[in-house]
A protein has these predicted regions:
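Alpha-helical metal-binding/catalytic segments enriched in His/Glu/Asp
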Residues: 102-106, 316-317
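Extended beta-strand/beta-hairpin segments
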Residues: 5-99, 111-311, 319-399
Length: 399
């Protein structure tokens, strides 16, 4: 019998009773779209849109439904946190989704670029390291996330010379990759905020693409896996020991670095295998499978890199909402978001990433100004929103 992820109370106010461990569903699966009736996301002007509907579950757990516009594929994934945030460590942490999604996209871009150049790939190993920092005081409002340049190391074997593979790698990352553009450009995020079904005045850039959408609470009541999805898309491969003392992520004053590592390769069946884990602070490792980005040609047996990447943004931002509210002891009974990410995929070396647009729906007893402050601080302390608004250049080397 399949246990559905639903609550015995109102779906907006009872999210604390829903958990990953109470469900028989896998950590990731493709969703049967017949009962969801989501608004289509057509491909306009060559722009690929990815829409994420996300909600909180028990503790630090979260659930997201990700809609990939060009093919209308819908995926459901869940996220958790490790001991650094008193999580239950049952699913990948948010930065794992972002890191794995970036890696999957870059691997696909490398393979496509090699094909265009006639460079043969007999084997491929891909190493990626992402570094994020958190510094400041949550109580004083000075806490902020920042990002360091991503490091990519590629080991490719074939009949061609090493310099050919290096040229392919540099071109794939710096000239072909739409995913990497979200790190390369300075993209300020846009928001709309709704508290208890009441629209609030957001002082920053407006999220016009999502501001008029309906609270996504009911989306999660009609999720069913598509038949035939027997492949385990996400699983834990290594478990970190339980932390001792206070959870470092819940300390009011912080100065720390987060290091996430990914090891990627291509399986014989063509799926991309991604082993991602948190190096500092020490965390568990998860294996995530991904299929190609191509609108034409991909079998969509697993989420694409852009799906995982978009899920990571949503999960990380939601973690910061809950973390800030917990540290500052603000009343927050539940929260959900609808997030749009957009990319222009291109074979002509002119890709593009667009600013993230997010509708935030809060269930709270706090006044309007504090609700706005929760969202403002969540953006300020979100590692991935920091990556979007900070232009960095990815470092590429050949092993």
């Amino acid at each position: 019998m399949v246990v559905r992820l639903t609550s015995t109370r109102d779906s907006r106010m009872g999210e604390d009773k829903v958990s990953i461990q109470s469900s028989a569903y896998p950590l990731a699966f493709r969703v049967d779209p017949s009962e969801l009736k989501l608004e289509p996301l057509p491909l306009v002007d060559g722009i690929t849109r990815v829409r994420s509907y996300a909600r909180t579950l028990e503790g630090m757990q979260k659930e997201a439904v990700i809609q990939y516009g060009p093919t209308a594929a819908i995926w459901r994934v869940v996220s958790d946190e490790g001991p650094w945030l008193n999580g239950t460590d049952l699913a990948p942490f948010p930065l794992a989704f972002f890191t794995a999604g970036m890696a999957a996209s870059l691997i696909s871009d490398f393979v496509d670029e090699a094909g265009d150049r006639g460079v043969q790939i007999d084997s491929l190993e891909f190493t990626q390291d992402n570094f994020f920092t958190m510094q400041g005081s949550a109580l004083k409002g000075t806490m902020a996330a920042s990002v360091q340049p991503m490091q990519v190391k590629i080991s490719a074997r074939g009949k061609d010379a090493a310099e050919d593979y290096l040229r392919v790698a540099e071109s794939a990352v710096h000239e072909r990759s739409a995913a990497n553009r979200c790190l390369r450009e300075d993209l300020a995020s846009r928001f709309a905020v709704r508290a208890n079904d009441h629209d609030l005045a957001w002082p920053g850039l407006a999220a016009d693409a999502v501001s008029a959408l309906t609270d996504p609470a009911s989306v999660f009541d009609n999720i069913r896996p598509m038949s035939g999805g027997d492949t385990t898309l996400i699983r834990k491969t290594d478990t970190v020991a339980e932390a001792t003392g206070d959870a470092v992520g819940l300390v009011a004053d912080q100065k720390r670095v987060v290091h996430v590592n990914n090891q990627g390769s291509i399986r014989k069946d063509g799926l991309i295998s991604l082993d991602v884990g948190c190096i500092h602070p020490p965390g568990s490792c998860f294996r995530m499978l991904s299929d190609g980005e191509d609108v034409v040609g991909s079998q969509e047996r697993a989420p694409s890199g852009l799906v995982y990447l978009s899920a990571g943004i949503a999960f990380c931002f939601m973690t910061q909402i809950g973390r800030y509210a917990q540290i500052t002891k603000q009343s927050l009974n539940g929260y959900r978001i609808i997030q749009d990410t957009a990319f222009r995929l291109s074979q002509n070396h002119d890709p593009q990433a667009f600013a993230v647009e997010t509708l935030v729906c809060l269930d709270t007893d706090e006044p309007d100004d504090r609700s706005i402050q929760i969202v403002r601080m969540a953006e300020q302390t979100c590692y991935i929103h920091a990556a979007y608004r900070t232009a960095t250049r990815t470092e590429v080397t050949l092993a």
